[in-house]
Amino acid sequence: VKYAEFRARDRFDSRELLAFAHGTLVEDPPEGMSARLPTPPLLMLDRVVEISRRGPRGRIVGERDVRLDDWFFQCHFLGDPVQPGCLGVDAVWQLLGFFCNWAGGLGSGRALGCGEVEFFGQIRPHDRLVRVEVDVRRYAELPESGSAIAIGDATLLVDGEPIYSIRRAKTGLFRDIAYRGYPNPGERARGGRMER
């Protein structure tokens, strides 16, 4: 799709999210558009069913089909399969990062943390649908640093029942931090503290 069409869309299917993860969805990306979603198996979304923005606020809703053979059910826990709660939190960060790109932010995405996380349910192999609803409380582009940030509150539901609550989840886009030379050593081959 063309960049203007990408920015105008209000939903994305599984193929499109996978193409975004591989950096091939947008045919004419602006300079600096380097963010990606993770590829499977860490991609925790099958589709974005709603995305909208009103000024500094917005909303993004993603869904994932639960599969009996999902990789995490094979190891977490043996004899008592349950999706790790942290993967639900990661789905929220993935959606916020995608929102930043869709809203016009440029750079590579990074999760920046969250406030309160509460788990009051679980995802099991015979569940059908995980829905992640994120209300973006603030989206801002920071021209001096060339970065963008989204902060949101999220509810994760399984088969229509709320089971996780995540408050003040934060994801940012940052320019000139991508490490494209993997597995070779290079300028950005090591981690450590990021300057804000």
Model-derived regions: residue spans:
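Non-catalytic linker/capping segments at the edges of enzyme domains
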Residues: 1-82, 102, 107, 120, ...
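Compact, glycine-rich, soluble single-domain proteins
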Residues: 79-80, 92-95
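Short nucleic-acid-contacting surface segments enriched for D/E, G, S/T with interspersed K/R
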Residues: 88, 123-131
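Acidic, glycine-rich low-complexity segments with interspersed aromatic residues
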Residues: 90-91, 104
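N-terminal export/assembly segments and adjacent metallocofactor-ligating motifs
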Residues: 109-113
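Conserved double-stranded beta-helix
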Residues: 115-118
